[in-house]
């Protein structure tokens, strides 16, 4: 099958096989990987090095003739003292050959055609040379690299040496698996040094096609075999030199190498175009979804909202076809909920103003009984803090008006592993608090040498808010609906409890994560850098909240749960369809190779 036909006949599979990577943090949608196009690139590369990308030409000089010339050149270089004489190389056995080669091809090793890990000779410490650390080495198929300029005296010791025309391969995980490999070009003075995590091959003959050799050490089969040969501990595994210099490489006639590289480059350009079209299409789709969903939250009244919803529901199957679009729908539902637009209002419901009066009376009584501390009165929510008009029966208030005592915990030095059971105390990590989700397993074991502080134990009904950490992890909130015993909050988590059972803790937790209250918390974050931000208890107490009647709170939560069930079913079907597309892309790849 011609590769162009392989691409065009199955364009729908290559472009629709998507994979979502989950990413933690408030408001983060999973990043989409174009899995099908990635598999297509790998397939083209694998076909290239197996002799299946371009047709063979019987008039091409066989690879064996070029290898003879390289061997003669090597002998001459040894005579001239330019390279050291090698021990006789072992022939590649039949068992070592991973697949059958076309006529005119030969199996070689890099040690046959190159000097491995050579040195450079520079005598002047003041001479400027290129310096190439690992971040300057790309994963691109063209072997591109960036460079810095250093003086030889600064870097002559403790680094890997290389020169223009050398081919280098990253040997450490995960750089090797990510195919970091390079052809050095344009080095200052023709020479350079860089990261010690490289194997370097200096080709013996100018007849060698460096780009073709590079394709081999980036091919999926080569990377897979290299990964299986790695040695060392986790996180520090490396591909040994013996693999780099001795693993069999398929070697075609020189003219075919040039045809392979040319065709490969053209097909990569096609893949680039396909990738760009897919990304543009995904972006356009997401923008369309967000624009249409914005019409719901921007609706001025119930009639306009109904019209806009009817317009969207006509195209439901077309609009909500990605995980990001379904997540956007969920966020819109939450936004409508806290604006009072999700459910119809009942004029017979007791207004929230009466609820707030009872809460205030209950608070006064608790202060008298010494169960909570008296707090300074909070100012009314100003008009500037009210971004929209509330439905009849709703009231603006502040978090501090409806809660009992607020506190934060403590952060003793703990063992990293979680507490195994309820007999052993643990301290919650901030990752226990996710948006609208409590994860009790995210804790650290309190050492036996430290006494627990039961006053910080988390209880059912507590609302938790992350107080300190990276910007995207501060102000994240959840309700503890149910928890095991003997888990304490850390000093990076604020905890509070509502005064009255007539206020839904689920609804308040929702407000903390979406809408006016969440926006206020976002604006209240402070810190010298985004990597370490804070929210104070005072700011949290002052956060405005749109409080509906009790009956509406319960109705809102019930409606959200119903909507979310539908969204989760949509997402489950989508994930199942995506998995099928991934399997199709894999099957197509296997069929083309075999």
UniProtKB/Swiss-Prot annotation:
Top-level taxon of the source organism: Bacteria
Short name of any one Pfam family annotated for the protein: Methylase_S
Keyword Disulfide bond carried by entry: no
Disulfide bonds: none
Statement: the UniProt record of this protein carries the keyword Transit peptide: no
InterPro entries: Restrct_endonuc_typeI_TRD, Restrct_endonuc_typeI_TRD_sf, Type-I_RE_S_subunit
Key words, A-Z: DNA-binding, Restriction system
Notes on the domains: Contains two DNA recognition domains, each specifying recognition of one of the two defined components of the target sequence.
Subunit structure: The type I restriction/modification system is composed of three polypeptides R, M and S; the restriction enzyme has stoichiometry R(2)M(2)S(1) while the methyltransferase is M(2)S(1).
Cited function: The specificity (S) subunit of a type I restriction enzyme; this subunit dictates DNA sequence specificity. The M and S subunits together form a methyltransferase (MTase) that methylates two adenine residues of the sequence 5'-GAGN(7)ATGC-3'. In the presence of the R subunit the complex can also act as an endonuclease, binding to the same target sequence but cutting the DNA some distance from this site. Whether the DNA is cut or modified depends on the methylation state of the target sequence. When the target site is unmodified, the DNA is cut.
Note: Type I restriction and modification enzymes are complex, multifunctional systems which require ATP, S-adenosyl methionine and Mg(2+) as cofactors and, in addition to their endonucleolytic and methylase activities, are potent DNA-dependent ATPases.
Identification of the protein by name: Type I restriction enzyme EcoEI specificity subunit
Organism: Escherichia coli
């Amino acid at each position: 099958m011609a590769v162009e036909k392989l691409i065009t006949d199955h364009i729908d599979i290559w472009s629709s096989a998507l994979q979502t990577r989950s990413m933690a943090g408030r408001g983060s949608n999973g990043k989409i990987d174009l899995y099908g196009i990635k598999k297509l690139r790998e397939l083209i590369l694998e076909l290239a090095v197996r002799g299946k990308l371009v047709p063979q030409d019987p008039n091409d000089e066989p690879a064996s003739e070029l290898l003879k010339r390289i061997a003669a050149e090597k002998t001459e270089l040894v005579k001239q003292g330019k390279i050291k004489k090698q021990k006789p190389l072992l022939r590649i056995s039949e068992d070592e050959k991973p697949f059958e080669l076309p006529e005119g091809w030969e199996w070689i090793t890099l040690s046959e055609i190159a000097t491995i890990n050579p040195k450079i000779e520079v005598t002047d410490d003041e001479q400027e040379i290129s310096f190439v650390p690992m971040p300057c080495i790309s994963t691109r198929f063209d072997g591109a690299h960036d460079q810095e300029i250093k003086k030889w005296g600064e870097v002559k010791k403790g680094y890997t040496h290389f020169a223009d025309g050398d081919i280098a391969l990253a040997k450490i995980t995960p750089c090797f698996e990510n195919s970091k490999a390079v052809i050095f070009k344009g080095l200052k003075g023709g020479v350079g040094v860089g990261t010690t995590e490289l194997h370097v091959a200096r080709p013996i003959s100018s007849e060698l096609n460096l780009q073709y050799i590079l394709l081999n050490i980036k091919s999926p089969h080569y990377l897979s075999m290299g990964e299986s040969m790695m040695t060392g501990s986790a996180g520090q595994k490396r591909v040994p030199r013996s693999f780099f210099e001795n693993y069999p490489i398929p070697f075609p006639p020189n003219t075919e190498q040039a045809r392979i590289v040319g065709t490969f480059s053209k097909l990569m350009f096609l893949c680039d175009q396909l990738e760009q079209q897919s990304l543009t299409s995904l972006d356009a789709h997401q923008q369309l979804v967000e624009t249409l969903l914005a019409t719901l939250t921007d609706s001025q009244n119930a009639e306009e909202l109904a019209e806009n919803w009817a317009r969207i529901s006509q195209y439901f199957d077309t609009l909500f076809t990605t995980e990001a679009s379904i997540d956007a729908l969920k966020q819109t539902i939450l936004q409508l909920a806290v604006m009072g637009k999700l459910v119809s209002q009942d004029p017979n419901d007791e207004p929230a103003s009466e609820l707030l009066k009872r809460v205030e009376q209950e608070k006064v009584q608790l202060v008298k009984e010494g169960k909570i501390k008296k707090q300074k009165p909070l100012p009314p929510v100003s008009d500037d803090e009210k971004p929209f008009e509330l439905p009849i029966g709703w009231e603006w208030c502040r978090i501090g008006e409806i809660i009992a005592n607020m506190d934060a915990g403590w952060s003793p030095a703990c063992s990293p592993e979680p507490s195994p059971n309820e007999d052993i105390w643990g301290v919650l990590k901030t990752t226990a608090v996710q948006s609208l989700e409590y994860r009790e397993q995210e804790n650290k074991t309190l050492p036996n040498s430290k006494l627990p502080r039961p006053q910080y134990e988390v209880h059912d009904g507590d609302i938790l808010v992350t107080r300190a950490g990276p910007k995207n992890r501060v102000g994240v909130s959840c309700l503890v609906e149910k928890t095991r015993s003997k888990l304490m909050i850390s000093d990076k988590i604020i905890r509070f409890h509502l005064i009255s059972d007539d206020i839904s803790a689920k609804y308040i937790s929702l407000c903390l994560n979406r809408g006016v209250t969440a926006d206020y918390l976002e604006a209240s974050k402070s810190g010298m850098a985004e990597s370490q931000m804070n929210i104070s208890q005072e700011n949290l107490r002052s956060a405005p909240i749109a409080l509906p009647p009790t009956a509406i709170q319960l109705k809102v939560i019930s409606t959200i749960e119903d909507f979310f069930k539908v969204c989760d079913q949509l997402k489950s079907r989508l994930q199942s369809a995506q998995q099928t597309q991934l399997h199709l892309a894999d099957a197509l790849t296997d069929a083309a190779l075999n």
